[in-house]
Amino acid sequence: PQVTKYLLWAPHPDVAATRRVITEKLNAGADEKTWVIESRHRGEVIGLASCRRTAPHSVEVGYCLGRRWWGKGLMSEVLGMLLTALDADREVYRVWATCSVDNERSARLLEHAGFYLEGRLARHAVYPTMGPEPQDSLLYAKILR
């Protein structure tokens, strides 16, 4: 429940649903990429990270990590790698992300990575585990050049 609380999708009801989502991600176009985050020691899947080009020079990043791996600096490392790769793409000027106004850990992660708070988006997104009503989100951005 802690991991899925702030996600924009509901937990998958079964393995078949997870397989469908994985297939969709694998078949996504060039403007959207998703990576599995794997434990170095055990090789088990511990999270996901994604990039989605939302405009010619703008990319949205997203991420989630299993509760057991929180507080170990792993997502900071992953986000750093994504930013390094995006900075190498001379067409990308802006990287952005949103998170629930209640997701303090995600907001701190983004700020630590050099993102700045652009504003609060009123009734921006439905977080399924928080109910059917749209909730406020925070909009963060990092300008690469």
Question: Language-model segments: which ranges?
Answer:
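Acyl-donor (CoA/ACP) binding surface of acyl/acetyltransferases
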Residues: 36-145
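A general structural signal marking secondary-structure boundaries and capping sites
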Residues: 1, 25-29, 90
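A short helix-loop-beta-strand connector motif used in the catalytic cores of GNAT acetyltransferases and
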Residues: 24-36, 47
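Conserved GNAT-fold acetyl-CoA-binding loop/helix
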Residues: 2-24, 33
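Juxtamembrane/interface motifs at transmembrane-helix termini
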Residues: 14-17, 25-28, 39, 66-68
